[in-house]
């Protein structure tokens, strides 16, 4: 067995001598292969996969290696093929170890917030755990918004941070922040690793926690001296999560599912209210709708979980949902709430929401059941298992249960005809809704769509056709501006060959504009679709409606020359060597979008739209369906 010192020397020599071209070719080959499933998951928490042998690692199974290498090998054993990591003093050892990995590719974003949003986009679009890595201090704190976002939107992520050496913890050392304490309330769980021998177990637990039950972010903080310490890893240590595993939801009882189906049989006006918790249940949901004929509305997080072009789709409900979706929920006598949390942007005035309906709430997280709206029947279970169980009961029934909701669906079809989504048109100005409709038409509704936060986000939700789960990526619960570009890039990494479009606003886009560098360097085919109104559009809309149009720092252009488009995103994009075009007239839009989609690699399209446009319909905050606003814009005095 090699000594620790000899192994350390051999390790350093191997790193400096490793041919970069060979490793790059290996990684490219891996990139083309389908990503392996996460082994450290709820389905198979104790099935570690040994990493392949490689000359980059000059040690045998029983030889010591650095803690950082144990960490990277642990990630490999959990099926990780991509990480989003930005180096710094306290994480350098991890980056050195990554250069010795034959299978993990690092995607170098230019800001830790960008890399963490990319990990989120990667996870949202693929269902796999997204991994981001940052240094201590400001590197770690730059992850905070993305961790909070992932917790609210139930995104499986593992964030790994470097930390100052153990002996310096608590001394206010350079770039020291107590990131475990900082993130305690915005992660599902977090760890401070104080023993190098704990790394394999902690990583396995982190992936299991992130991906099981209600998914969420887990943070692992590793001091630098632990990363440098030599040790022989023990890979078969069992996880130590007895309380957590015992509380994981069990398959739903057949008696409860039969009770739900009895309620469906007694109902005349049922509605399915579907959220992000159905992302893994699209097939089961479609089958349930086929068997019952119940109309479906989705939350912002639920877009794509049921095809929005299906005749039984009511599209999105809530503050900026369709009239007919909100009408259906208001008139319903039965509301089947699947994988939702009765968020305030959906319910408005909670007492008035679905006030005529019996409510069935199915969710994997017991904390969500009864938190905002008390259900008549609650099932704490995986929605996928609940739907599978109900489908089996429906398909196996000797009497072949049949439901007739024809008159109810006819009533809703009439609402669709009377109150379709719409907007005012003009000959010259480009309506943002029109631009998205053209994008939808030219991509045939097949693109993965990422967005920032604001008016453009709502228009993208309303006017693009979402046909499958994991097609829509947006910061829903936290509402974090700057999410769109890095999330789209992360989705592009996870889904090579798939068209990915970042529908963004000028305000959101500018918050992480530096990530144009990364998509250019890796030549990711991310199409940046900026709806540029020179304002913080959603805040302007609220100023128009509720503050007598008094502008309070919502203009983002140049006050000394308001006719100028400022900043010039076309010039900025070209500075990153990304082709870019600006369009200002409606008759230019179709050809410009077609060129964007046909151009290989990244592309930016700057679409100038009027700032007076409002997102409609709109239910004011705290309002009810009866308070819905259907017309007007910034050209109107309120």
UniProtKB/Swiss-Prot annotation:
Chain segments carrying region Thiamine pyrophosphate binding: 455-535
Enzyme Commission number(s): 2.2.1.6
Alphabetical list of CDD domains matching this protein: TPP_AHAS (cd02015), TPP_PYR_POX_like (cd07035)
Cofactor note text: Binds 1 Mg(2+) ion per subunit.
Record family assignment: Belongs to the TPP enzyme family.
Other comments on record: Acetolactate synthase is the target enzyme for sulfonylurea and imidazolinone herbicides.
GO CC, one annotated term: acetolactate synthase complex
Compositional bias of kind Low complexity: 1-19
Enzyme class: transferase
Subcellular location, record wording: Plastid, Chloroplast
Main location class: plastid
Catalytic activity, reaction form: 2 pyruvate + H(+) = (2S)-2-acetolactate + CO2
Organism: Zea mays
Ligand binding (thiamine diphosphate): 112
Segment annotated as transit peptide: 1-39
Record keywords: Amino-acid biosynthesis, Branched-chain amino acid biosynthesis, Chloroplast, Disulfide bond, FAD, Flavoprotein, Herbicide resistance, Magnesium, Metal-binding, Plastid, Thiamine pyrophosphate, Transferase, Transit peptide
Domain of life from the UniProt record: Eukaryota
A biological process from GO: isoleucine biosynthetic process
Cofactor(s) recorded in Swiss-Prot or TrEMBL: Mg(2+); thiamine diphosphate
Pathway(s): Amino-acid biosynthesis; L-isoleucine biosynthesis; L-isoleucine from 2-oxobutanoate: step 1/4; Amino-acid biosynthesis; L-valine biosynthesis; L-valine from pyruvate: step 1/4
Residues binding Mg(2+), per UniProt: 506, 533
Lineage: Eukaryota, Viridiplantae, Streptophyta, Embryophyta, Tracheophyta
InterPro entries in UniProt: Acetolactate_synth_lsu (IPR012846), AHAS_TPP (IPR039368), DHS-like_NAD/FAD-binding_dom (IPR029035), THDP-binding (IPR029061), Thiamin_PyroP_enz_cen_dom (IPR012000), Thiamin_PyroP_enz_TPP-bd_dom (IPR012001), TPP_enz (IPR045229), TPP_enzyme_TPP-bd (IPR011766)
Disulfide bridge positions per record: 132-278
Encoding gene per record: ALS1
Full protein name: Acetolactate synthase 1, chloroplastic
Residue span of region Disordered: 1-23
NCBIfam families: acolac_lg
Any one GO molecular function term: thiamine pyrophosphate binding
